[in-house]
Amino acid sequence: MRNLDAMGYNAVSTDPLYKHIPFTITQRSDISYGLFYDNLSSCWLDLGNEIDNYHTAYRRWQAEAGDIDYYLFTGKQVLDVTKAFVRLTGKTLFGPKWSLGYSGSTMHYTDAPDAQNQLMNFIRLCEQHAIPCDSFQLSSGYTSINGKRYVFNWNYDKVPQPKVMSQSFHDAGLKLAANIKPCLLQDHPRYGEVAERGLFIRDSQTDAPERSSFWDDEGSHLDFTNPQTVAWWQEGVTTQLLEMGIDSTWNDNNEYEVWDGEAAATALAAKSPSNIFAR
């Protein structure tokens, strides 16, 4: 159970998923129970699939680091168990009503050289074909420079008037959600500034920003255990998105696929920073 960007996941032949929560539920005829393993490191769960001549089917949990800390929830029904679980962890917030409607999305529009025209044409096509639509997911092409993605960077050649474009969507009754990524490529226009301020996860050997493979290059992931990083991120969302008329964010590629198991963060109490930040 390690958070990986598992694009193309196959339920039959592959293990990794995008996100993992080490919580299992068992249902019996007269009782249901759940086990939540409170450990942020990479872990393994064997739910009775191994065969041992000397033992009946058993379950096994193994963690790369940390304590054996778990919670047991019981109830007559699975619903009782899940209610107890979310009382401990907190619930998912209800999204706005518009988030339940049809939402358009494609990388084609924002990757096109005339992205703004393509996006405006989407509005016209919805009207032409009487397609009800409540929102559009703005893929990361709007941030690109030479094909690579740079969070909080508008490509004004593709989208020369972000505010005008946003207003056109609003006039048509559509909300906009913009793609953002919590990792800066090594040649991001603001990489040096962010590195100098110590806002990245740090390499365990050099104390320099840790670099991992990310979107056709190498990049450094932001350390959100640092309050200054949170403030920098909030400033970027506000000035580059909300003030441009964007209604919501699409937090993408946030698996934190960091393979340096000893990488350091401001408030890191366990191994596997990838799991800590992704969860």
Labelled PLM ranges:
Residues 1-99, 105-108, 115-117, 123-128:
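Catalytic and substrate-binding clefts that recognize carbohydrates or anionic sugar/phosphate headgroups
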Residues 7-15, 73, 110-114, 154-157, ...:
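Conserved aromatic-histidine-acidic binding/catalytic patches
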Residues 96-103, 138-139, 253:
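Short coil/turn segments at secondary-structure boundaries
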Residues 102-117, 219-232:
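Active-site mouth loops of central-metabolism enzymes
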Residues 112-129, 229-239:
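Short, acidic/polar
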Residues 132-279:
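Aromatic- and carboxylate-enriched substrate-binding clefts and catalytic-loop regions
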